């Protein structure tokens, strides 16, 4: 009975998605527009009325451009962290996509990053005739703006894309103006614990977190490894972080400050002794998206208390919806 109910629910998702895939005057360009993908090749997009978006930053960008109504399926992380896409069909984790499930939604355009996969599935999308736009997956502010402009052009929304890219510049200018006033250079250790993870982990280099720490004027003391590792007493104590950074969900899951102080070594660090454990919204570390400048500005304020309590984070901008 449960299996039958799940099947009917998935069928309803697909039916709804297919009904939404009707080209509109502003999403169907008969001659097509040409955009450059991560490999430097030109991709011609002639119909963007029915989009599968893989990657939270890509999904965030599409909604920020006001084209959320064109999205008919997203990866699991997008569904989890971007409220507007929570009820859409999920196509799996970005690194383990299934061609059958995605192609069943009859997309006209698939947008993903270069780290999506497996590679053979991406090739299946292309071989099936579905326009597939693969974007860079490196973590820099300049890459964010390139991706915003590329996605906007692929959706025939270039003016909105330019406006969004300019807003990123403005947000980063505000963040850097604050940073220029800062006098400290704190060692910032990012830690976390997933819902199904028995042990807490910490971030090394080569992650969105590492780059965000750098942009906000901090120093990641875990520079000897890439990616993530389980926390150990010795590594954390030797790192001697001034501040512990953690996502809000992980903070709550761990039992707040008292729970984080029980993570390996934390209580013996300057951050632990001074209770400088700072939770931030999870979206900050879900890939660089158009909100990167606002996120950096808030982190600058949290990292550098000498800037003063009166310095407030900039308000978040809301994404508009495109009307059909």
Where are these regions (language model features)?
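Short helices/loops that flank or line small-molecule/ion binding pockets
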Residues: 99-106, 232-240
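Bacterial N-terminal signal peptides
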Residues: 9-17
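Alpha-helical, coiled-coil/dimerization segments enriched in small aliphatic residues
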Residues: 76-80, 88, 201-228
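Structured C-terminal subdomain patch of bacterial secreted/periplasmic proteins
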Residues: 23, 143, 149-153, 162, ...
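Short helix-initiation/N-cap motifs at beta->coil->alpha
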Residues: 36-38, 89-100, 138, 225-233
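Extracytoplasmic ligand-binding site segments that recognize negatively charged/polar headgroups
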Residues: 118-121, 133-150, 184-208, 252-255
């Amino acid at each position: 009975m449960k299996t039958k109910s799940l099947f009917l629910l998935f069928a309803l998702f697909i039916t709804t998605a297919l009904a939404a895939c009707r080209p509109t005057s502003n999403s169907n360009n008969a001659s097509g527009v040409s955009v450059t993908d991560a490999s430097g090749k030109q991709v011609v997009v002639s119909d963007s009325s029915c989009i599968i978006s893989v990657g939270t930053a890509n999904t965030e960008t599409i909604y920020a451009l006001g084209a959320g109504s064109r999205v008919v399926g997203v990866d699991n992380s997008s569904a989890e962290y971007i409220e507007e896409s929570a009820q859409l069909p999920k196509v799996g984790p970005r690194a383990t996509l299934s061609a059958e499930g995605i192609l069943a939604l009859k997309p006209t355009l698939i947008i993903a990053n270069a780290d999506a996969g497996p590679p053979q599935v991406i090739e299946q999308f292309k071989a099936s005739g579905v326009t597939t736009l693969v974007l860079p997956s490196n973590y820099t502010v300049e890459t964010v703006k390139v991706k915003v402009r590329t996605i906007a052009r692929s959706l025939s929304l270039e003016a909105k894309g330019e406006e969004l890219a300019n807003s990123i510049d403005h947000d980063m200018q505000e963040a850097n103006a604050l940073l220029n006033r800062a006098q400290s250079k704190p060692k910032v250790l990012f830690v976390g614990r997933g819902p199904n993870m028995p042990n807490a982990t910490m971030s090394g280099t080569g992650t969105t977190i590492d780059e965000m720490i750098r942009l906000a004027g901090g120093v990641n003391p875990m520079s000897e490894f890439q990616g993530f590792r389980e926390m150990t007493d010795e590594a954390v104590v030797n790192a001697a972080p001034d501040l512990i950074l953690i996502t809000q969900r992980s903070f709550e899951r761990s039992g707040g400050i008292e729970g984080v102080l029980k993570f390996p070594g934390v209580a013996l660090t300057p951050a632990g002794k001074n209770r400088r454990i700072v939770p931030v919204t999870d979206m900050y570390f879900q890939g660089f998206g158009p909100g990167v400048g606002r996120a950096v500005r808030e982190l600058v304020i949290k990292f550098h208390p000498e800037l003063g309590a009166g310095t407030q984070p900039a308000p978040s901008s809301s994404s508009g919806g495109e009307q059909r």
